[in-house]
Amino acid sequence: NGGYILQIDGTCEGDSPNLFTGMDEISGIILSSVKINSEKKEKIIPFLRDIQVKYGTPLAIVSDMGKGLLGAVQEVFPQVSSLICHFHFLRDIGKDLLDDDYRDLRNRLTNSKIRVALRSKAKDFEEKLGQKMRDLAKIDGDPELAATKTALLFINWMFDTSSLSGYGFPFDVKHLLFYHRLISGYEQMKQLYELTGNKPFYQLIKLLRRIDDDQELERTASLLDKNEMIFNELRKALRITLPGNQQGLNDSGEMCDMKSIADKVDKFVKKYDSSTDSLHLKMIEQIRKYDEKLFADPIIVTVDGQKIYVQPHRTNNIMEQFFRYLKRLLRKKGGNISVKRSLTAMLPGTVLVKNLKNEEYLDLLLDGTSGLEERFAQIDSRVFLYEFSKMKSQNKKPPADAKK
């Protein structure tokens, strides 16, 4: 197929070793996997050199922005185009832009104990409605019960996060959404109380007034609104993790011309280049620093005498999706939410089994034989034992529950 594009990423849980894996994004074949105790440059270089020896030099490399990883790539493959994942890039930009104010907002909301108060009030309302919850006609016919039902619905709405996209922070700012719902709910309760004078509305007004009166919360939320708007502009320029998109962590970005995206990002940079805000200037500095690693022209390769164009992926989502798939399997097998012990005990080469679902890989592996049994029978047992001992040397003693 003219070569391979190397995607690199790692996964761990707690203080487990990092399962560091390389995959060809064109074929989807996992090329290699090792365990390392950190993502320092000197730990990653042997992994990359091994891939270079086995598979040659890749057409391009896609990874996250880890300093050690980028340094190792530069040392082993200095002439290869090294690209960073747009999702990781945006996530880092967003955290730098929003994190401090977002933490302040979250802490002030926590200290206000508004969530506890609202949940307690919701429980009171539910008990008041009791069995009548199933008979809406009886509730709506009683003004006080109807007001209780409405107030309860407003509380549930304040806590609702279904409008979020599923990307996590900084793409989803659930605490800022909650704050705005509280303020909106407060205004709605005041209007309803003025119209009806019903007690449940007044009870919510008393709870929510502390949030509306908190000027520091209002100031912090205002700063977040401003910077979230700027962050969303950059998301739109890069055409990935767009607000309102429901793909969540499976979002690999829209199929767009790279030059068009680069031009829009350039316009974004020029728009905020003159800002006096230190957060904005740091954001612009980051974009300029990684500019060459963000936008790649299609790569021309020759296959069967014909020139074809290969466009590297904009994200390393295929690696992220694989790791989520692996952790789901480990949770299902071990029966534990945490996969730390299973990752620690697992031989790094285990992930290569996933390749057996790839028809192209299976054809290469079988090499004309009728099946895996016949193919494995051709392998010298001494070679197998040598390779197996190498893999075992990377592992601690497996815990009992990991042997299931």
Regions found by a protein language model. Give the residues of each.
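RNase H-like nuclease fold core
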Residues: 1-79, 99-103, 125-192, 318
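Intrinsically disordered or highly flexible coil/loop and linker segments, enriched in small
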Residues: 57, 103, 118, 122, ...
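Inter-helix linker motif
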Residues: 77-101, 105-106
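Amphipathic alpha-helical/coiled-coil segments positioned at domain termini
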Residues: 82, 303-388
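A polyampholytic, Gly/Pro-enriched intrinsically disordered region
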Residues: 100-119
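Long, low-complexity or tandemly repetitive, helically biased scaffold regions used
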Residues: 127, 156-260
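Charge-dense, extended regions
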Residues: 237, 241-271, 275, 283-286, ...
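Amphipathic alpha-helical
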Residues: 255-337
